[in-house]
Amino acid sequence: MEPQADIALIGLAVMGRNLILNMNDHGYTVVAYNRTLSRVDDFMADEAKGTQVIGARSIPEMIAHLKRPRRVMMLVKAGHPVDEFIEKLMPHLAPGDIIIDGGNSLYQDTIRRSKYVESRGLLYRAEE
């Protein structure tokens, strides 16, 4: 499979779905992923039908669709879920790839995560 997507977005609640569609409308190819796979299926069959959005059913599949440097945005519940996804993503990413936390994380958590992720050669950006 030839990587073709510009960014991946994890989290298909209302904000995630709408951000994916907005990026698609502006010419970006986005990979959509959610830990509840039925949300991916429903999104792809409904709002994303007929778009350039790519649905992924696993993290390795999601990463395989991305052009380098790979960009993964998370819109997941603040706290432990962010840490869980960082741990799930890191084995599949390489130095220079970017993890973006678009959620509402506590700034102390953002500082801790940034140091951790960047110590492994990845970039970490978050809303503050």
Model-derived segments and spans:
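The beta1-alpha1 cofactor-binding region of Rossmann-like NAD(H)/NADP(H)-dependent oxidoreductases
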Residues: L37, I59, G79, Y107-D109
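Glycine/threonine-rich flexible loop motifs
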Residues: R71-K88
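Short, well-ordered coil/turn residues at beta-beta hairpins
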Residues: H65, L75-V76, G102
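NAD(P)+-binding Rossmann beta1-loop-alpha1 motif at the extreme N-terminus of oxidoreductases
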Residues: M1-R68, H92, G96, R125-E127
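Rossmann-fold NAD(P)-binding glycine/threonine-rich loop
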Residues: E87, A94-I98, G102-E128
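Short glycine/serine/threonine-rich phosphate/pyrophosphate-binding segments
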Residues: R17-N18, P81-E84, Y107-I111
